[in-house]
Amino acid sequence: MGSILQTTLNTRALPTGDFRYVRSDYPGKLTDEEVRWLFQNGITTIVDLREEKEYVSRPCRLEKEEGFSYYHLPVTGGGDTPKSPEAVAETYLGMIDEQMDKIISTIMNAESNVMYFCGAGKDRTGVVSAIILKKLGYSDRVIIDDYMETKENLMDFLVAYVREHPQVDINIIIPKEENIRRVLEAIPVL
């Protein structure tokens, strides 16, 4: 499917048939036209899931744009970057904490359509998306398919990243169905 914004790789609406919930990678190079498009489509609540260091070093222009409400609510759980492919699901499960409750509540109770994002729109954004879709009553299959769309959208970027950073194991950073399935098994009833 690709990104609905030209300056991002992984911005897309959740499969709800509208723009109520839009997940994204870092929207750091938005054009004036894209900002207008977001505003015209009522996507005016912005939730930044990045940790403090990312937030400070790579600001998002939407924080200062008139007509937008900006919330910096970093995903706090999950710990360090996983050291093995098997540890990715555990990292995801660690994200489900009180801060995650606040994030989900802010997104689901927003008065406008919401765009939420992290760096790549993959891990933190993927867990948030899975929880939102689960709360909305979507099947595990729909949730997994949404998560796996990130793999399609980011594959070229991830391969290039590993080429530039050979110490990174591509099997850790590529989205895998079993990782989000573990999250869904941990939150069967919300």
Which sequence ranges carry the predicted segments?
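Cys-dependent protein tyrosine phosphatase-like superfamily
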Residues: 1-115, 127-190
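Ser/Thr-glycine-rich phosphate-binding loops at phosphate-binding pockets of nucleotides
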Residues: 120, 124-125
